[in-house]
Amino acid sequence: MVGWLFLGLLLGLFFGILTYRIVTGRRRPDRLTLAEYWVYVEEPRVPKIEAVMTRMVSENPHTKPGSPCISNREGMLFTDLRLHYAAVLKSKNPHAFRPDLFSVSTEPTAEVLERLADCPGFLKCRYQCETLLKDQRHLTFLPHMADAFSDLAKGHVVYDPISEEIMTREEFKERISSAKNLESPLFHLRIVWERAEEGWRAVTKGLMKVGRSEWASSFQEQDQEVLVAGLFT
């Protein structure tokens, strides 16, 4: 009797673990997917989600006839628990308004620095997942959410902490308008020529958006930038 009870407990434990894996997905610490945008604004309050949805779907200025930017496929992310957005105040996080404290590859222009001085906060939107994704719809959804935040809260500057790139609101908007496919690496991936003690190397910035580790070349002489970076494209 005890043996059958023990067997029943083992089977229950096995099926419990199996069900958990099916529901949550297979976790891979090395496959963290993280995409994020900071939109520096005059009005650091998260707009009502209904207004954001309207701006992204029915009133999206980037939509072309017969080809909506945010379809039902992307729209499902509005209720995805892996989507996070919040307001961040300059008074409580002054370091987040200092691009000189960001990575070396983040190169703000004089105009960006001037605009940052006029922003009392920023709106952050992030998509983070620790399981293998079936598609990359978040790569389309998140830039449009950042652009909507910018329009609704009087944005001035947009920072991408994953690709380590900062730009004016107009530059970001133009990139979205001119992009044929926001899920393309051309929109999200950068190749940076980076200096270290051992020499220079080409490094990718943005692969974490699709759950992959950044790539890096072997160390080279400084004048090999064009040749080495070309191998990544």
Predicted features and spans:
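Core hydrophobic alpha-helical membrane-spanning segments
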Residues: 10-14
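Transmembrane-cytosolic junction motif
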Residues: 16-34
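N-terminal mature-domain "stem" immediately C-terminal to a signal peptide or N-terminal signal-anchor/transmembrane
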Residues: 31-47
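Conserved aromatic-histidine-acidic binding/catalytic patches
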Residues: 37-41, 130-138, 219-224
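Aromatic/basic-lined ligand-recognition segments
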Residues: 164-233
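Feature marks short, highly hydrophobic, charge-poor N-terminal signal-anchor/signal peptide-like helices
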Residues: 1-8
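N-terminal low-complexity, intrinsically disordered segments
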Residues: 45-114
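Internal, hydrophobic cores of structured domains that mediate oligomerization or house catalytic pockets
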Residues: 86, 90-192
